[in-house]
Amino acid sequence: YMDSFKYALSGEFAFQKDMLSDIRIPSDWGLEMGMLSEIFRNQVSNKVCQVDISDFYDHKHQVMSFDDKSKGLSKMSHDIAKSMFRKMATFGEVFSEERIRTIKAAYYRIALDLVDSYESDAIMNGISYDRHNELKSIELFAQNIISAGNDFLTHPKDMPFIPSWKRVASAVPDIFEKMIDAVDSDY
């Protein structure tokens, strides 16, 4: 399912408003993975599709942030990995330190194997390729798999989602009227 999306981490998605009531939206950089897994959980697969709206895709990139794990791609990769651990656990996957180390080792080996391929693609397309920085990035992401896994194991009660609208409406039955009133009073 996840592998079928071309830009699963792009940050752009759309859905019909009737789906919104049951979806729990993640409150961190795991947004896209969390949303896709919520859609998978709540919808039949033939109601899900990807649409390319442009021939060119210009995504605004984050800095790598090698020195500050609370920012940039370092923070993003940590949150995304933790999101994947959480979601896989909801499908019955069991995690341990050993399993997380195995996932990190598999990621690291696959990433290293792809470096040569990406470098060749860059050369063929006249794009500069910084092999050293690419390898540093791979090492950072591998470390973040371990740290995200450790966070997941040591904080099992974390609530990473914003409550679904169905839950909000059950706690505050007139929430939608209050929101309309708030918007009207600002307008």
Predicted segments with their positions:
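Conserved nucleotide-sugar donor-binding
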Residues: 8-23
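Active-site donor/metal-binding and catalytic loop motifs
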Residues: 49-69
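Terminal low-complexity segments of carbohydrate-biosynthetic enzymes
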Residues: 67-187
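Short, flexible, basic/aromatic active-site loop/helix in glycosyltransferases
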Residues: 1-5
